[in-house]
From Swiss-Prot:
Function as written in the Swiss-Prot or TrEMBL entry: Autophagy factor required for autophagosome formation. Target of the TOR kinase signaling pathway that regulates autophagy through the control of the phosphorylation status of ATG13 and ULK1, and the regulation of the ATG13-ULK1-RB1CC1 complex.
Protein name: Autophagy-related protein 13
Pfam families in alphabetical order: ATG13
Name of encoding gene: atg13
Polar residues: compositionally biased ranges: 354-363
Coiled coil (UniProt feature): none
Annotated segments matching region Disordered: 295-363, 413-432
């Protein structure tokens, strides 16, 4: 099988399969980051663009892929698999899909390694780039956040499809024939996304402390652990990866027609955190023109994982000034955090810093005069921006939605004019001396209401504060009613004597 291949073709084929496997892992994991990835195309690709695709490698993913491969290549009976799963904030997990790169024994002896295999692998990688966006896991990855995260796991060996449960679907992304076998890239994804908590099936702790499943072998004990696609816990250890990974080797083979250009790493090289940099110094974005490092004129400081400050090289590959002046966009796939450092930023006047920290007592104030439209009562305020908290105060937009609630707006101290109603209110309150004048009645006319309201709160309080005297307490009325009762007493007695028999009969009946 291998006798027909020359040593150079065999070396090129192994190299193509190796970097295709590494690039496939990058494409799958980056498709589950939850963010859209925008890559700027270039008319002059360099030798580091494998398979004619400018895929920005994540060093952590490349490290995990190489650790899973351990120097092996996908061959007959040996498959490289990438498992994508979902984990909730409560600890429940669910496998979503499994991507598998395997090889069978069907060979194509007449195919040319240098041209045909390389081009077909490039087409297969582009197909993978499209298929990763149409499976159900892609929609879930776009909605990940505090409730759940998407995890990935890379392992080498037999395909494990038990976690997908019943009803999973399998799709073949594509195949590429080689002189040593046929590479096949497939995907098995879960169709039943109804989540069922696995915590209800967990064993409860025995009373006697006996481990029930002590002699039960765990399934796949040698497989690697799950890793978050775009989430890193604070307790995880930050690993330092080299600036230029092995996957960024110049693609120079026996069929290369152009000389290898100077390799320029556009990836994030992880540097140790700057000592003395507080959280307030890492909370503002980095501008391209002001984020140039003093040590290297072609490096820009960009946010790294765990508040690290990686250096992004902006040196052009061919020395073109147009390539150097292009705006660099740092992909969230390469950056775990969302904060960036303003330590290396230039001052608004244009003077560049050399790493020394500016003293906090040197505050530069930038004054803006906001334009006020017609029919505005208050004068135009002068807005003062302190450059101690904002590194680039000149770039702060001059228009604000709400000036009253803006903490950075400083209005000049002007005496406030009181309205006549307010002056009358204060004068009435200050001149009040009797208990009846403690409450000042202000005419209140609510919108969409009648002017002749029968009663309001003030009228109600006034009436019950000074209630009228009870009629029963009046002496004249009491004397008059008693005289009337005495005058009518003989008539009542005569009526009682007249009806004496009826009253006696009523008493006897009781």
């Amino acid at each position: 099988m291998d006798t027909d291949l020359s040593p150079q073709d065999r070396k090129d084929l192994d190299k193509f399969i190796k970097f295709f496997a590494l690039k496939s892992v990058q494409v799958i994991v980056q498709a589950r980051l939850g963010d859209k990835i925008c890559t700027r195309s270039s008319s002059s690709p360099t030798g580091s663009d494998w398979f004619n695709l400018a895929i920005k490698d994540i060093p952590e993913v490349t490290h995990e892929a190489k650790k899973a491969l351990s120097g092996q290549l996908p061959a007959v009976g040996r498959s490289m698999c990438v498992e994508i799963s979902l984990k909730t904030s409560e600890g429940d997990s669910m496998e979503l899909e499994v991507w598998c790169l395997e090889m069978n024994e069907k060979c194509d002896r007449d195919i040319k390694v240098s041209y045909t295999v390389y081009n077909r692998l490039s087409l297969l990688l582009k197909s993978l780039l499209a298929v990763t966006r149409v499976t159900p896991a892609y929609r879930l990855s776009r909605k990940q956040g505090h409730e759940y995260v998407i995890l990935y796991r890379i392992y080498f060996g037999d395909v494990q499809l038990l976690g997908l449960k019943e009803g999973f679907q399998a799709v073949r992304v594509g195949t590429v024939g080689t002189p040593v076998g046929t590479l096949t890239l497939t995907c098995a994804y879960r169709t039943n996304l109804a989540f069922m908590s696995t915590r209800q099936y967990e064993w409860t702790q025995p009373i006697m402390g006996i481990i029930i499943d002590h002699f039960v072998d765990r399934p796949f004990p040698s497989t690697s652990h799950m890793h978050p696609c775009n989430y890193r816990g604070a307790e995880e250890q930050v690993l330092t990866y080299p600036a230029v990974e092995e996957s960024q080797e110049v693609c120079t083979t026996s069929f290369s027609t152009s000389p290898p250009s100077q390799l320029c790493s556009s990836r994030l090289s992880y540097q140790p955190a700057v000592p003395g940099a507080g959280p307030s110094e890492l909370g503002y974005p980095v501008a391209l023109a002001t984020g140039v490092s003093a040590g290297h004129p072609h490096q820009m400081m960009a946010p790294g994982k765990e508040s690290g400050l990686p250096a992004v090289s902006v040196q052009p590959a061919h020395g073109n000034q147009a390539e150097h002046d292009r705006t660099l966009s740092v992909s969230p796939a390469n950056v775990a955090g969302t904060t960036s450092s303003s330590e290396e930023a230039d001052s608004p006047s244009g003077s560049s810093t050399t790493g020394a920290k500016s003293s906090p007592n040197k505050n530069t104030h930038v004054l803006f005069t906001r334009k006020v439209g017609a029919f505005v009562d208050k004068p135009s305020p002068q807005v003062t921006y302190a450059s101690t908290d904002i590194p680039f105060a000149v770039f702060v937009p001059k228009l604000a939605d709400n000036e009253d609630t803006d903490p950075m707006v400083v209005y000049p101290e002007t005496p406030e004019e009181e309205s006549p109603e307010a002056r009358s209110l204060h004068s009435s309150c200050s001149s009040s001396g009797t208990p009846q004048d403690d409450f000042v009645m202000v005419d209140f006319k609510p919108a969409f209401s009648k002017d002749d309201l029968p009663m309001d709160v003030g009228t109600f309080y006034r009436e019950f504060q000074n209630p009228p005297q009870l009629s029963s307490l009046s002496i004249d009325i009491a004397v008059q009613s008693m005289a009337e009762d005495l005058d009518s007493l003989p008539e009542k007695l005569a009526m009682h004597e007249k009806n004496m028999k009826e009253f006696d009969a009523f008493v006897d009946s009781l």
